[in-house]
A protein has these predicted regions:
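Short hydrophobic/aromatic-enriched beta-strand-loop microsegments
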Residues: 127-130, 145-157
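A general structural motif
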Residues: 82-88, 109-112, 153-163
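Peripheral docking tails and interdomain loops at the edges
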Residues: 153-210
Length: 210
């Protein structure tokens, strides 16, 4: 597909072949190379391509991922293995900074998400303090064996006071696994997601990524 302008350079760099040259030669019928099974080769790197979202440039937009195309670009990341490549991609697209142990994580969203309990347990065992703004989420988290969470005051209409709350509890990143897009701008999941972006905090809202 010659229209895949971003995929062509990505695949060319990953596999070490300039496919634009190959395609051009094939079109004009000159110096067409013999077919080669590039996937049979061994490479010393792994590469992935991830979407780039522009939530910081869209004031008030809900940083919610749905089926529609919401990305405004892509980033290619390389690493020695899949995990290194993925870490590089997260850092380059979201400004993700690894939160420090014993700092706060704000959890919210759909507690029926299968991964929710696993995520909360791992974070707690790593030494993070778990916070939430919803009583149902609080009850769910505190019902997980050997996990403790605290529900905090969460001003929905006052960004300055909300910033103070984030600072007081040393909340360093937000995980919000909401199932549906927020119906309005006073929805607590929307407020958590939007202000994570506005405060420059890492936001994760996809279960597998979390």
């Amino acid at each position: 597909n010659l229209r895949a302008s971003r995929s062509f350079p990505f695949v060319s760099k990953v596999l070490g072949v300039n496919f634009i040259d190959v395609a051009t030669n094939a079109i004009v019928g000159e110096n067409v190379p013999e077919p080669v099974d590039l996937m049979a080769k061994t490479y010393n790197h792994v590469a992935i391509k991830v979407p780039q979202f522009s939530w910081t440039r869209l004031a008030g937009a809900d940083p919610f991922l749905g089926v529609e195309m919401a990305s405004t670009g892509e980033v290619a990341s390389f690493g020695a293995d899949l995990h290194e490549a993925y870490w590089a991609s997260i850092a380059s697209t979201t400004g993700f900074r690894v939160p420090q142990p014993h700092k706060g994580v704000l959890l919210g969203g759909n507690i029926d998400t299968p991964e929710f309990k696993i995520i909360a347990t791992k974070l707690y065992n790593l030494g993070f303090k778990l916070f939430c703004s919803n009583p149902d989420v609080e009850a769910f988290l505190n019902n997980i064996p050997h996990v403790a969470a605290k529900r905090i005051w969460f001003p929905l209409k006052d960004k300055r006071k909300l910033r103070e709350v984030f600072d007081d509890y040393e909340i360093q990143f937000v995980i919000n696994l909401a199932k549906y897009r927020a119906p309005n701008t006073t929805n607590e999941d929307y407020v958590a997601r939007r202000n994570a972006v506005d405060f420059g905090l890492p936001l994760l809202n996809e279960p597998k990524t979390c």
